[in-house]
Every structure is written in structure tokens, then in C-alpha cells.
């Protein structure tokens, strides 16, 4: 027993040391752009202006032929954090996005309406800035975000990455970024996703020995007023944010944080992926998305119907709606209706939108299901680059 006790004490000491080395980035929760537009009665016009029918969506996304991000992924984003670039620091609000790998912020040279509505980066005001000069382009829906690549210090809650290459956008498409609560995006995906061959921020954190462990983790609070307690943690994970033990799931392709699904169950019936399919765990997507034909069946199964271009349910039926369970690595991850239905107040009336959305991701990248914030709110998520695996456990409210 004595050697076992010593081993246990050593493990506890290692855990305590790892806890002390955690770098926590607070995430603030804001009203999503979709809710803003819905409250202003402008959501239908937004669909029309972007040529989108959200009830029959098949927006193509193929990251292997070009760097392409579905624009609608950011329509429902609610969790944001702060970073700084340069010396002295210039602050920006960003989405920490595991579904992409580039860092970009608006440039002072940008003339798009979105840049006029957000802070912009001034390279001439940073003593540590280096011009790289390469061009980059990321496709968002039907428009491109384009710019040049520079290098500078990037700081995230006490972690300072030297010589980080990042995108300075000079053109941003559409109205989505105009009204967005965020200024830019910090990608946490694998290097193979990065436009312009840029080394992602977290890879540089590891290379510069800034993190104790080669992993980061995400906790998204369900608190609708500000998301109190939500955080991104670099260098490890915090056991106080989840119950039980982590289930470790191998990454099947090192681009997105892609894992295998064993099945998707609605109520007591496995409706999808009965022979297995692929999914990504993505902090840069608010909803849960899947192939449009499968999502249409899922909407019907939960009783959701099209209303003003999106799916919603009668708020009075939540008690009778089915659970939706994702079977992953022989473990069940169950969402009850209050988890996957998104309440809103529109002109004094309760609105209950569906947390599921159709999104066509064709081969070779797809088809894919995306487990976005609707899923991550319920399951604490650890992204382990050292072992190329994702850890999931029930989140503690």
C-alpha cells in the first residue's frame, strides 16, 4: 500500500502543479447577431440579402480546395474573449475558433463597412511589428475576406507569443461582420487548415514553451446574462468544470478537431450514423449542424417547423419533446429539449428556435456533423494536441 500511496501523492502533486500553470481566458457572452436581427425585425431581410434559405441550407464548404468558412457559423456566436497585438498593446475582441486556424483582425487599411465599425490594427503604432507581406484569403459564404500577413507579439491573458504571423484584413464581406460583436477570429485548429501557411497561435505557444501541457479546454456557461464563468484554458483542464471523468476520443483527421460518431439517437431510436460518421467539435459554430437532409428529418422528429426562414417549436411542447443523444466512443452524450432549444423574446412573445441547422460540407472534407456551442455548453471539452484526442465530460452548471 505504501508505494501506491506515494504514487497517489505524486499524481496529486502533478495535478496541483498543472492547475497552477493554467492560463484562463474569460469568455463574455453577448446577444448573437441572429437575435439582434430578429428583435429588429430584420432577420428575413438578412436571409434575402445573403441569398440564404435556412430551412433548406446547402452552403458549400470545402477547406481542402480553398480556405472556406460558412458565413452562417458566426451568425449565432455569443462567446468572445480579448487579445492584444503589438507593443504597446492594441486590444481586439475575438472568437476563439477550433474550426479554423488563422488569426486575423481588421487592418487600418481596410475600407469595408465592417472595418469602420470595429477597432483596427495600426502596424505603424507597434514597436514589435514586422511586415511579412504575403497575401491571404478566406472564403466566407459568397464573399472573401482578404488581406496581408504581418507578424507581431500576440498576448492572451498573460501568454505572449513572439513573432506570431496574423492576417490584417483589408476587405471583409457582407453585413455579418458589420454588426458582429467580435472584431476578428483566433483559430485553434490544426496547421493544415491555416491559410498562407501560417503557424497557428497555439502551435507557437507550444513551440515557445508557454504552456505546461500541449492542450487547451473550453467551458461555456449556460448563464444567459453574460455567460458568467465561461473560459478558455490554455495548458491543461480544470476538473471543477465537469463531473465524472473525461472520455478521450481519438482525432480521426488532423485538420479540424474531427472525431468519429457511432450514432445519433432521437428518443429511443438511432436515426442517423447507425454505421458511423464523422463530426468536429467546433467552438466557432454556435449550433449543431449536419447534412441538410438529415437535419430536416431531425427537425421533423423534434416537432420543429419553418417560421420566417428558420426552424422553431411551440414553446409549450418542450416537456414532451424527445432527447437527442450522440453516441461517441461507446459513451452517450444526451441533450434534453432545454439544451437544444434556444429561447428568445420577440415583441414580448416567447420564441423557441431549434439548435440544429443544415450545412452541406461535401467531400473530401465532408460530410460532417458539427458539434458547436449547443453541445459544448453541456459537455466540457478538452483539446489535446499532445495525444491528438478530444476529452469530453458533463459540464458542471
From Swiss-Prot:
Summary of the tissues where the protein is detected: Expressed abundantly in the stomach, club cells and alveolar macrophages of the lung, brain microglia, spleen and activated B-lymphocytes. Not expressed in resting B-lymphocytes.
Active site: 97, 282
Record bears the keyword Plastid: no
Record field: transmembrane: none
Catalytic reaction list: Similar to cathepsin D, but slightly broader specificity
Pfam families: A1_Propeptide, Asp
Protein origin, superkingdom: Eukaryota
InterPro entries for this protein: Aspartic_peptidase_A1 (IPR001461), Aspartic_peptidase_AS (IPR001969), Aspartic_peptidase_N (IPR012848), PEPTIDASE_A1 (IPR033121), Peptidase_aspartic_dom_sf (IPR021109)
Any one of the GO CC terms: endosome
EC top class, as a word: hydrolase
Signal sequence segment: 1-20
Annotated glycan sites: 91, 323
Covalent S-S links between cysteines: 110-115, 273-277
PTM (free text): Glycosylated. The nature of the carbohydrate chain varies between cell types. In fibroblasts, the proenzyme contains a high mannose-type oligosaccharide, while the mature enzyme contains a complex-type oligosaccharide.
Entry's family note: Belongs to the peptidase A1 family.
Protein name: Cathepsin E
Organism: Mus musculus
Amino acid at each position: 500500500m505504501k508505494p501506491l500511496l506515494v504514487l497517489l501523492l505524486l499524481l496529486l502533486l502533478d495535478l496541483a502543479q498543472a492547475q497552477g500553470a493554467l492560463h484562463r481566458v474569460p469568455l463574455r457572452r453577448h446577444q448573437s447577431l441572429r437575435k439582434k436581427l430578429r428583435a429588429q425585425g430584420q432577420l428575413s431581410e438578412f436571409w434575402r440579402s445573403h441569398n440564404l434559405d435556412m430551412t433548406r441550407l446547402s452552403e458549400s464548404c470545402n477547406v481542402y480546395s480553398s480556405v472556406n468558412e460558412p458565413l452562417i457559423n458566426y451568425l449565432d456566436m455569443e462567446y468572445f474573449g480579448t487579445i492584444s497585438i503589438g507593443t504597446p498593446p492594441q486590444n481586439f475582441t475575438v472568437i476563439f475558433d477550433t474550426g479554423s486556424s488563422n488569426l486575423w483582425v481588421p487592418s487600418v487599411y481596410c475600407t469595408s463597412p465592417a472595418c469602420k465599425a470595429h477597432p483596427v490594427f495600426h502596424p505603424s503604432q507597434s514597436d514589435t511589428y514586422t511586415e511579412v507581406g504575403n497575401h491571404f484569403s478566406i472564403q466566407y459564404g459568397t464573399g472573401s475576406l482578404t488581406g496581408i500577413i504581418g507578424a507581431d507579439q500576440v498576448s492572451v491573458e498573460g501568454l505572449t507569443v513572439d513573432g506570431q504571423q496574423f492576417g490584417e484584413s483589408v476587405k471583409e464581406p457582407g453585413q455579418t461582420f458589420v454588426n458582429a460583436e467580435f472584431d476578428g477570429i483566433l483559430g485553434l485548429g490544426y496547421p493544415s487548415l491555416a491559410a498562407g501557411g501560417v503557424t497557428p497561435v497555439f502551435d507557437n505557444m507550444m513551440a515557445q514553451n508557454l504552456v505546461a501541457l500541449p492542450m487547451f479546454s473550453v467551458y461555456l456557461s449556460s448563464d444567459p446574462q453574460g455567460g458568467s464563468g465561461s473560459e478558455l484554458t490554455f495548458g491543461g483542464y480544470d476538473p471543477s468544470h465537469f463531473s465524472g471523468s473525461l472520455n478521450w476520443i481519438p482525432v480521426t483527421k488532423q485538420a479540424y478537431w474531427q472525431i468519429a460518431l457511432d450514432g445519433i439517437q432521437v428518443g429511443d431510436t438511432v436515426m442517423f450514423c447507425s454505421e458511423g460518421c464523422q463530426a468536429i467539435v467546433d467552438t466557432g459554430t454556435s449550433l449543431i449542424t449536419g447534412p441538410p437532409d438529415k437535419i430536416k428529418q431531425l427537425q421533423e422528429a423534434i416537432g420543429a417547423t419553418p417560421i420566417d426562414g428558420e426552424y422553431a417549436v411551440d414553446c409549450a411542447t418542450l416537456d414532451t419533446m424527445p432527447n437527442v443523444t450522440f453516441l461517441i466512443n461507446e459513451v452517450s452524450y444526451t441533450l434534453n429539449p432545454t439544451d437544444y432549444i434556444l429561447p428568445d423574446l420577440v415583441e414580448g412573445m416567447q420564441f423557441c428556435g431549434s439548435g440544429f441547422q443544415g450545412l452541406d460540407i461535401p467531400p473530401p472534407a465532408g460530410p460532417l456533423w458539427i458539434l458547436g456551442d449547443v453541445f459544448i455548453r453541456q459537455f466540457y471539452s478538452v483539446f489535446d494536441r499532445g495525444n491528438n484526442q478530444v476529452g469530453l465530460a458533463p459540464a458542471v452548471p
